[in-house]
Amino acid sequence: MQPRVLLIAALLVLLASARALEAEDPSLLGLMQGYMQHATKTAQDTLTSVQESQVAQRARDWMNDGFSSLKDYWSTFKGKLSGFWDSASEVQTTAASDAS
């Protein structure tokens, strides 16, 4: 073969491979865009999940604090009521022994 024919054949092969690479670039770009969209959605979903988890934790803490305060209030009320009940019983016992 003549050197010109080899040179032209090599040039045609290079042009054909360059065209093939150009055809792959948009699909590679599309693939990367799809990957980035998926990664963005995953990050957003994770962030939303974490925020919802934090809100749920705050709600649980608020409920626990409320129940704790209610139990403290009930304990105080019960203590005062039982103290009143005990003193009322003593008054009745004392009054009954004085009457005898």
From Swiss-Prot:
One GO term describing the cellular component: spherical high-density lipoprotein particle
Modifications the protein undergoes after translation, according to the UniProt entry: The most abundant glycoforms are characterized by an O-linked disaccharide galactose linked to N-acetylgalactosamine (Gal-GalNAc), further modified with up to 3 sialic acid residues. Less abundant glycoforms are characterized by more complex and fucosylated glycan moieties. O-glycosylated on Thr-94 with a core 1 or possibly core 8 glycan.
Spans annotated as Lipid-binding: 68-100
Molecular function in Gene Ontology: high-density lipoprotein particle receptor binding; lipase inhibitor activity; phospholipid binding
Site (May interact with the LDL receptor): K41
Carbohydrate attachment residues: T94
Places the protein is found: Secreted
Signal peptide: 1-20
Keyword presence, Chaperone: no
GO biological process: cholesterol homeostasis; lipid catabolic process; lipid transport; lipoprotein metabolic process; negative regulation of high-density lipoprotein particle clearance; negative regulation of low-density lipoprotein particle clearance; negative regulation of triglyceride catabolic process; negative regulation of very-low-density lipoprotein particle clearance
Keyword entries, A-Z: Chylomicron, Glycoprotein, Lipid degradation, Lipid metabolism, Lipid transport, Secreted, Sialic acid, Signal, Transport, VLDL
Family membership: Belongs to the apolipoprotein C3 family.
Biological role stated in the UniProt entry: Component of triglyceride-rich very low density lipoproteins (VLDL) and high density lipoproteins (HDL) in plasma. Plays a multifaceted role in triglyceride homeostasis. Intracellularly, promotes hepatic very low density lipoprotein 1 (VLDL1) assembly and secretion; extracellularly, attenuates hydrolysis and clearance of triglyceride-rich lipoproteins (TRLs). Impairs the lipolysis of TRLs by inhibiting lipoprotein lipase and the hepatic uptake of TRLs by remnant receptors.
Name of the featured protein: Apolipoprotein C-III
Lineage: Eukaryota, Metazoa, Chordata, Craniata, Vertebrata
Gene name of the encoded protein: APOC3
